[in-house]
A protein has these predicted regions:
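Residue-level signal for inorganic ion chemistry
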Residues: 33, 160, 261
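Bacterial Sec-dependent N-terminal signal peptides
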Residues: 1-11
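Histidine/acidic-residue-rich, glycine-tolerant segments that coordinate divalent metal ions
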Residues: 103-111, 117-118, 134-256
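Acidic/His- and Gly-rich active-site-bordering loop/insert found
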Residues: 9-112, 121-141
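A generic structural motif
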Residues: 72, 255-263
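Short glycine-centered, acidic/aromatic-flanked micro-motifs in structured strand/loop junctions
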Residues: 35-37, 147, 263
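Short beta-strand motif preference
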Residues: 85, 194-196, 259-261
Length: 263
């Protein structure tokens, strides 16, 4: 038992040292992705940088997988086990990245509030470290880095799964930036997204309201009924919505309205 633990610790130390020796390089990659701050399905620079980083380490890179320009799979090695490491690199909308103790106007820009600049980079570092171990030890095994775009509401991985890109994977490893370094078992809720669009008839809200048919009324009626539905769902159910289009002026009956749902 002691010998087995010693061997495992030695393997761990070799892999960890591989990452530590390249710390400054990975820090530079993370900082660049931070500066790009690209939203889902628009991560052109971030995706290209991660592909370049992995390619320079001997990975073969297949880009544009699942018909998504910013999705890719980088592979090294052969045979089993096939280890997948997932990387994300999309930012969130409407966020400032300046480190100040007060809220700044984001001016419709995006920011890395969820730490995906670290997510994508550290996953690449882990994949490279495993690659080095496979190479140096001359052992069988395949390491695959999955460049997964649009995690923040875009369901990028769903399309990759549908394309069968994970069909040969034995184990998939995933992580997320947090305020502590730990590992734990857990579960997540499934998520369905949908946009509901309502169409009506525009009219002046003061001069001739009787001629209007408010699309916004349809959105509000739907939201009210959904809120009443909450009483009859299980405790683990989550339903969220935001009105994305509700009209342009209060004195005009809106002929179009839209609500965006997560459930």
């Amino acid at each position: 038992m002691f010998i087995s633990l010693s061997v495992a610790q030695k393997k761990y130390d070799v892999i960890l040292k591989s990452i530590e020796n390249n710390g400054s390089k990975y820090e530079n990659v993370a900082n660049q992705i931070w500066s790009f701050a690209e939203m889902g399905y628009q991560e052109e620079k971030s995706s290209a940088l991660l592909q370049k980083t992995l390619f320079e380490e001997g990975f073969s890179v297949k880009t544009g997988v699942a018909n998504i320009p910013t999705a890719f799979v980088a592979s090294y090695g052969s045979g089993s086990p096939v280890i997948a490491i997932l990387g994300e690199y999309d930012a969130l909308p409407g966020l400032s990245q300046q480190a100040v103790p007060y809220k700044l106007s984001a001016n419709d820009k995006a920011g890395h509030a969820c730490g995906h600049h670290l997510f994508g980079t550290a996953s690449a570092a882990a994949a490279i470290a495993i690659k080095n171990y496979i190479k140096n030890q001359k052992i069988s095994g395949t390491i695959k880095y999955y460049g997964c775009p649009a995690e923040e509401g875009g369901s990028g991985k769903v399309y990759m799964v549908r394309e069968g890109l994970f069909s040969e994977v034995d184990v998939a490893l995933h992580w997320h930036a947090a305020d502590e370094n730990s590992a734990s078992a857990g579960k997540a809720l499934a998520n369905k997204t949908a946009k509901f669009r309502f169409y009506g008839v525009s009219s002046h809200a003061s001069g001739s309201p009787q001629n209007g048919r408010s699309a916004l009324d349809g959105v509000e009626a739907m939201n009210n009924m959904v809120n009443m539905l909450r009483e009859h769902t299980t405790e683990s159910t989550r339903i969220h919505y935001v009105i994305t289009r509700g009209g342009n002026a209060p004195n005009v009956v809106p002929d179009f309205a839209e609500v965006y749902y997560y459930a």
